């Protein structure tokens, strides 16, 4: 039976520290504030937005939501971004992805002020990670993976890590981050041939495919540590990861659950980044 790596325990520890830091900012009359930019009304985006706002309220972090039409002109979006960049009371900016197809993703990401880029979307902030500099903002989901492993005293040095995702949101930045911790990395994706033969040799497997219960026990060995990043919702609203949790937990050494796993840490790290930005800009 695997050890369950609960992310909510990690999140609670981070929040305890944030409470102290937010209290010190309040003494200086500084209230951390996040601006959320959402284009359209996709149910997943609205659910994520509500979760962020709820978590911010618990820590006395202010939020400001900009609800935008999906057909917003790029010029109008950039004007709004410039205004938020110049607002002293706004410390962090988060733009929900994916963007409408008519918007240039690189231009949008590059428009976020570097010191307010709390989910590391700006190419220059990402570039720092690819150069091995982990001192600035990191993408929240890859950082959540690192924080969970750190909390449970799982050393990355010398480990063979397989990441099943090659996106700029998870797979590519995470690969650079674990390299900085002296791990050996393999990135897999939808075109990878014989995926189980690769994952079975790994010490740690991180999956972010987005297909519920796709990954079964034959993908792992008895010493595998499994980090399931995905959150998939079935027709009844129940949450599942990529990994068939009930099937796999009987075989592997350790595994994150869904829910109460990576997602809870991801949201908490977003809050941490807002507080980081408020402290740096004060």
Swiss-Prot record:
Pathway: One-carbon metabolism; tetrahydrofolate interconversion
GO molecular function, one term: methylenetetrahydrofolate dehydrogenase (NADP+) activity
CDD domains named in the record: NAD_bind_m-THF_DH_Cyclohyd
Gene3D superfamilies: Leucine Dehydrogenase, chain A, domain 1, NAD(P)-binding Rossmann-like Domain
A GO biological process held by the record: purine nucleotide biosynthetic process
Residues binding NADP(+), per UniProt: 165-167, 190, 231
Domain of life according to the entry: Bacteria
InterPro entries the UniProt entry points to: Aminoacid_DH-like_N_sf, NAD(P)-bd_dom_sf, THF_DH/CycHdrlase, THF_DH/CycHdrlase_cat_dom, THF_DH/CycHdrlase_NAD-bd_dom
Enzyme Commission code(s) on record: 1.5.1.5, 3.5.4.9
Keywords assigned: Amino-acid biosynthesis, Histidine biosynthesis, Hydrolase, Methionine biosynthesis, Multifunctional enzyme, NADP, One-carbon metabolism, Oxidoreductase, Purine biosynthesis
GO cellular component, one term: cytosol
Catalysis performed (reactions): (6R)-5,10-methylene-5,6,7,8-tetrahydrofolate + NADP(+) = (6R)-5,10-methenyltetrahydrofolate + NADPH; (6R)-5,10-methenyltetrahydrofolate + H2O = (6R)-10-formyltetrahydrofolate + H(+)
Function statement: Catalyzes the oxidation of 5,10-methylenetetrahydrofolate to 5,10-methenyltetrahydrofolate and then the hydrolysis of 5,10-methenyltetrahydrofolate to 10-formyltetrahydrofolate.
Subunit structure: Homodimer.
Family: Belongs to the tetrahydrofolate dehydrogenase/cyclohydrolase family.
Designated name of the protein: Bifunctional protein FolD
Origin species: Clostridium botulinum (strain Loch Maree / Type A3)
Gene: folD
């Amino acid at each position: 039976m695997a050890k369950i790596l609960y992310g909510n325990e990690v999140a609670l520890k981070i929040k305890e520290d944030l409470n102290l830091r937010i209290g010190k900012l309040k003494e200086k009359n500084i209230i951390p504030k996040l601006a959320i930019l959402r284009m359209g009304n996709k149910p997943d985006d609205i659910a994520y937005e509500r979760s962020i706002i709820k978590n911010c309220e618990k820590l006395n972090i202010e939020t400001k939501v900009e609800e935008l039409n999906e057909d917003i002109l790029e010029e109008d979006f950039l004007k709004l971004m410039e205004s938020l960049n110049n607002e002293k009371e706004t410390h962090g900016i988060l733009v929900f992805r994916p963007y409408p197809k008519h918007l240039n993703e690189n231009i949008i990401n590059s428009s976020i002020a570097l010191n307010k880029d709390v989910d590391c979307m700006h190419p220059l902030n990402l570039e720092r990670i690819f150069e091995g500099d982990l001192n600035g903002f990191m993408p929240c989901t890859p950082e959540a993976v690192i924080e969970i492993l750190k909390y449970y005293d799982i050393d990355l040095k010398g480990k063979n890590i397989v990441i099943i995702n090659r996106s700029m949101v998870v797979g590519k930045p995470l690969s650079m981050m674990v390299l900085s911790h002296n791990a050996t990395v393999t990135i897999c994706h939808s075109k990878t041939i014989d995926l189980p033969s690769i994952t079975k040799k790994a010490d740690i497997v991180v999956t972010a495919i987005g297909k519920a219960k796709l990954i079964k026990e034959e993908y792992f060995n008895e010493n595998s540590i499994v980090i399931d990043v995905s959150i998939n919702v079935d027709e009844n609203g129940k949450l599942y990861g990529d990994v068939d949790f009930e099937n796999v937990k009987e075989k592997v050494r350790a595994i994150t659950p869904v829910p109460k796993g990576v997602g809870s840490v991801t949201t908490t790290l977003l809050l941490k980044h807002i507080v980081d930005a408020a402290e740096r800009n004060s």
